Amino acid sequence: MDSSRELSGEEPRSPSPRHETSKMRLSPDRPSHHPARPPASLASQPLRPAHYQDDDDSYRTHTPPPSQPRTKGFSIESILSPTDKHRKSPRSPPMSPSSPSMSSNGYSEGPIYGSTRHPLSATVPGLGRAALDELAAHRAAALHIPSAALPFSHLAHNPAFYAWMHGASFLHYHGMPAFNSHPPIAQPLTNSSRLAMAKDISPRPTQSHSSFGEEGGEKDSRGRESPDSEHRRNNGHEEDDDDDDDQSPQKKKKKTRTVFSRSQVFQLESTFEVKRYLSSSERAGLAANLHLTETQVKIWFQNRRNKWKRQMAAELESANLAHAAQIRAQANLAQVSAVHVHAYAQRMVRVPILYHENHPTTGSSLHSPNILPFPMPYPGSYHQISSSTSSTSSARSPTSTSIVT
């Protein structure tokens, strides 16, 4: 191409810096699938040196050495478009920065890839080692942004959000127009921008680091079970074991209830009425007569004594209640009778009753203050005193007869 321009007399044009960077990014171990062969008419012409300078110092041209095959186009689409090898190979899952197979310089080492390989080479296959190192350094610097300044910081552990964030940082670093449609991550976002970004970071059916196995546990890319899922599974088994342990004593404690016949119950009741407590010999003899064990007879007497104590307590309580009710009734009756007596005493009227007889003189003489019923006796007047006494007694009781004459 440069030789044809020299023959035509045109001044050679230097490719843009982006084209030059794209040429530098081509790795030597990946030759192009479309090598350009020089025409036969120009095969015998001598090649110019790799670098030459015209009158203008700003124009420089870089030609690859003759041993390396030359590619046809150096456009962005041809560089960024995946080759046939990458089309056939399956898309590798994005590597997390905390992966154990990631070294300190940003390269992945381990038996998965077989050799040292940059983690971003699968995402951008057309970039060289130097550009990938620079991009890895930029990504490491972007990872040191404080989580409080980032929107959607609660989605940092989401694999889809992680892949979207690093892809957006790569586009922002290279000035791609696809990233300019969204505001920078560190800048405050409006509601519409948040909704748009939420739609972009919605989970898609892509392969992630942790996948759910057939048993329902979380597994990483190597098939090992994550500690959280193992802990939950162990806790579930422990809880099931605890439930089994809790249910096992209940099953052991459950016993069959002994059913006694009517004759056995009658014999036991009659024995209990005679004696509340049995000795060991009496218990053994009763068990032998009833064809029961000593334990069954002992338990029956224990239950019967408990029932008897409950009955006695109930009877005593009912007797106490009846006695208390009787006492209250008597107290109420006494109170009512006292009230009635007091009311009757208040209604009573005292009326003086005079006793009148057919002897008004005697009655008048009794009420006269000058006549005494018993005059003072004097010596020599015994007959007079006796006569006065007899007259007084006859006045009080007319039917009585006088003894002294």
Swiss-Prot record:
GO molecular function, one term: DNA-binding transcription factor activity, RNA polymerase II-specific
Protein source organism: Strongylocentrotus purpuratus (Purple sea urchin)
Region (Disordered): 1-118, 201-259, 383-405
Residue range(s) of DNA binding per entry: 253-312
Record field: compositional bias (Basic and acidic residues): 1-32, 216-237
Family: Belongs to the HMX homeobox family.
PANTHER family: HOMEOBOX PROTEIN HMX
GO terms of biological process kind: regulation of transcription by RNA polymerase II
Keywords: Developmental protein, DNA-binding, Homeobox, Nucleus, Transcription, Transcription regulation
Record protein name field: Homeobox protein Hmx
SUPFAM superfamilies: Homeodomain-like (SSF46689)
InterPro entries, sorted: HD (IPR001356), HD_metazoa (IPR020479), HMX_Homeobox_TF (IPR051300), Homeobox_CS (IPR017970), Homeodomain-like_sf (IPR009057)
PROSITE patterns in the record: HOMEOBOX_1, HOMEOBOX_2
